[in-house]
């Protein structure tokens, strides 16, 4: 190669290394186009997800049509609706068509209807069938405040304690109004988990206790003792518990079965040759 050309090549390399390279800033139009592309991608991905109702945040069941989630979503809506109408006082049963009409689910398929009729509503513990129609089945079916007071009184007499407020609200139409009307005939107790329990207020048990007896009662330390130790101590003092003084269940004595006598079976050999074989024991014993 020509040495002049080699010299020129080396000089060009040196100049290229010494000159600083500056990158151009991206134009505003290119940045805006990138942002638009990102927005389009986000909108396309969000459009593929199941739609939800923006007004109340509830999930759109129709987007899951044909899936198990859609079926169970319809079932949950039906049960909640039946509970709400029972609490309003509408306790009469409805047909499936009436329920679907009131819950705005008349457009469900035949398979879903068949599943609701033959399996879902029949086996649901909160739904009962009355003459081919469906009604809500609460834990305590109460008609009015008198029925509530009788139930609380029965629980008190049997030593069952109180009843959860949510169970009463579930089964008693217009429960808050009835509870307010009962006034001091019932007592509220709030548990550590913030759930309220209703008790019957037995006014016959309201009496003044002597102050001296109260002091004696409060002076007995029982913090370090569990229920078993307290029960043992009371037994040693000759005080029996209510369980021991109450009626005891008599356990029926089971009759012994007579032992059946079974004959012992001995093994027998060569029964099929009984007429052919001969016994030579006497002959063998006669030999010297």
UniProtKB/Swiss-Prot annotation:
Pfam families: TFA2_Winged_2, TFIIE_beta. GO terms for molecular function: DNA binding; TFIIH-class transcription factor complex binding. Residues 16-56 are annotated as: Disordered. It is found in: Nucleus. Residues 63-143 bind DNA. Residues 41-56 have a biased composition (Low complexity). Keywords: DNA-binding, Nucleus, Transcription, Transcription regulation. SUPFAM superfamilies: Winged helix' DNA-binding domain (SSF46785). GO terms for biological process: transcription initiation at RNA polymerase II promoter. GO terms for cellular component: transcription factor TFIIE complex. Belongs to the TFIIE beta subunit family. Tetramer of two alpha and two beta chains. Recruits TFIIH to the initiation complex and stimulates the RNA polymerase II C-terminal domain kinase and DNA-dependent ATPase activities of TFIIH. Both TFIIH and TFIIE are required for promoter clearance by RNA polymerase. This is General transcription factor IIE subunit 2.
């Amino acid at each position: 190669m020509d040495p002049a050309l080699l010299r020129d090549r080396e000089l060009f390399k040196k100049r290229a290394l010494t000159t600083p390279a500056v990158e151009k800033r991206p134009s505003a139009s290119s940045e805006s186009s990138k942002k638009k592309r990102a927005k389009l991608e986000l909108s396309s991905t969000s459009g593929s997800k199941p739609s939800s109702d923006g007004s109340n945040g509830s999930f759109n069941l129709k987007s899951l049509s044909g899936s198990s989630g859609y079926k169970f979503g319809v079932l949950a809506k039906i049960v909640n609706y039946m509970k709400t109408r029972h609490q309003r006082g509408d306790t009469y049963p409805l047909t499936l068509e009436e329920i679907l009409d009131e819950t705005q689910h008349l457009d469900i398929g035949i398979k879903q209807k068949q599943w609701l009729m033959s399996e879902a509503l029949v086996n649901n513990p909160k739904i009962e069938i009355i003459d081919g129609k469906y009604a809500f089945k609460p834990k305590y079916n109460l008609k009015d405040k008198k029925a509530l007071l009788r139930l609380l009184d029965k629980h008190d007499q049997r030593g069952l304690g109180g009843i959860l407020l949510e169970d009463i609200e579930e089964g008693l139409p217009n429960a808050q109004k009835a509870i307010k009307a009962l006034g001091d005939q019932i007592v509220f107790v709030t548990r550590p988990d913030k759930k309220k329990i209703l008790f019957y207020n037995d006014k016959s048990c309201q009496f003044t206790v002597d102050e001296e007896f109260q002091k004696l009662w409060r002076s007995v330390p029982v913090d370090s003792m569990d229920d078993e130790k307290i029960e043992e101590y009371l037994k040693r003092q000759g005080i029996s518990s209510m369980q021991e003084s109450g009626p005891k269940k008599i356990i029926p004595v089971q009759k012994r079965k007579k032992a059946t006598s079974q004959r012992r079976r001995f093994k027998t050999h060569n029964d099929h040759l009984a007429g052919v074989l001969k016994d030579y024991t006497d002959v063998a014993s006669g030999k010297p």
